[in-house]
């Protein structure tokens, strides 16, 4: 019997995509996942995540990674529907994984409501929890896939742009966005214009 986990990475990022990853693995292999050292990606070093990524992929019965472009994120933020966007993409990922109970990390203050949305959209049994990436090893595995995929997206950008970590708390990131805007009179296509730092820069702040 399969168990599925879904998580995101880059939700708060100013630069780059929102990444949704899902993985399906046989229930009787959950202990094996734990013994490999799989846990919440935020508690692992980048080197550890990169090392675990191929191991998780090789163990998985199926997995899927979806990248939501900044422009799509911006349109959802403009309609105050970022949670709905995440639910929709999670549902799409779930339908690619095969049948099995799916655990998701809730971005909604009400996990039951969020799980209900994802379940309705995917037609699958979905259990939604806060901190699911810390509570369920299958979601931890998904969080590692999402985080590595997001980091690789940023690395590709770094080859031609000094974007830093991509997060708005990073002065290097904000400095790059401001410098690019001042030079070109427009935001880079990989920046979320709906995020406060970008709006302030466009407003002359």
UniProtKB/Swiss-Prot annotation:
Its cofactor is Mn(2+); Mg(2+). Its main location: cytoplasm. Keywords: Cytoplasm, Endonuclease, Hydrolase, Manganese, Metal-binding, Nuclease. Transmembrane segments: none annotated. This is Ribonuclease HII. A divalent metal cation binds at residues 7-8, 105. Its EC number is 3.1.26.4. Endonuclease that specifically degrades the RNA of RNA-DNA hybrids. Residues 1-205 form the RNase H type-2 domain. It is found in: Cytoplasm. It catalyses: Endonucleolytic cleavage to 5'-phosphomonoester. The lineage of its organism: Archaea, Nitrososphaerota, Candidatus Cenarchaeales, Candidatus Cenarchaeaceae, Candidatus Cenarchaeum. It is an enzyme of class 3 (hydrolase). GO terms for biological process: DNA replication, removal of RNA primer; mismatch repair. InterPro entries: RNase_H2_suA, RNase_HII/HIII, RNase_HII/HIII_dom, RNase_HII_arc, RNase_HII_hlx-loop-hlx_cap_dom, RNaseH-like_sf, RNaseH_sf. HAMAP family: RNase_HII_A. Coiled coil: none annotated. It holds the Pfam family RNase_HII. It comes from the Archaea. One of its GO terms (molecular function) is RNA-DNA hybrid ribonuclease activity. CDD domains: RNase_HII_archaea_like (cd07180). Manganese or magnesium. Binds 1 divalent metal ion per monomer in the absence of substrate. May bind a second metal ion after substrate binding. Belongs to the RNase HII family. GO terms for cellular component: cytoplasm; ribonuclease H2 complex.
């Amino acid at each position: 019997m399969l168990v599925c986990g879904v998580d995101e990475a880059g939700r708060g990022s100013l630069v780059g995509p929102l990444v949704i990853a899902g993985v399906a693995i046989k229930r009787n292999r959950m202990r094996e996942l734990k013994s490999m050292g799989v846990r919440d990606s935020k508690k692992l070093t980048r080197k550890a995540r990169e090392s675990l990524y191929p191991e998780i992929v090789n163990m998985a019965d199926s997995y899927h990674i979806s990248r939501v472009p900044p422009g799509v994120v911006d349109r959802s933020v403009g309609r105050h529907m970022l949670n709905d966007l995440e639910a929709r993409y999670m549902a799409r990922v779930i339908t690619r994984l095969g049948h099995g109970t799916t655990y998701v990390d809730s971005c909604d203050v009400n996990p039951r409501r969020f799980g209900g949305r994802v379940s309705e959209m995917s037609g699958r049994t979905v259990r939604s929890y806060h901190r699911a990436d810390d509570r369920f090893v299958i979601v931890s595995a998904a969080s590692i896939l999402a985080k590595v995929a997001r980091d690789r997206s940023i690395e590709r950008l770094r080859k031609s742009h000094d974007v830093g970590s991509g997060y708005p708390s990073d002065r290097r990131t904000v400095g790059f966005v401001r410098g690019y805007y001042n030079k070109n009179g427009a935001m880079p296509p990989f920046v979320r214009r709906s995020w406060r730092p970008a709006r302030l820069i466009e407003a002359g702040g």
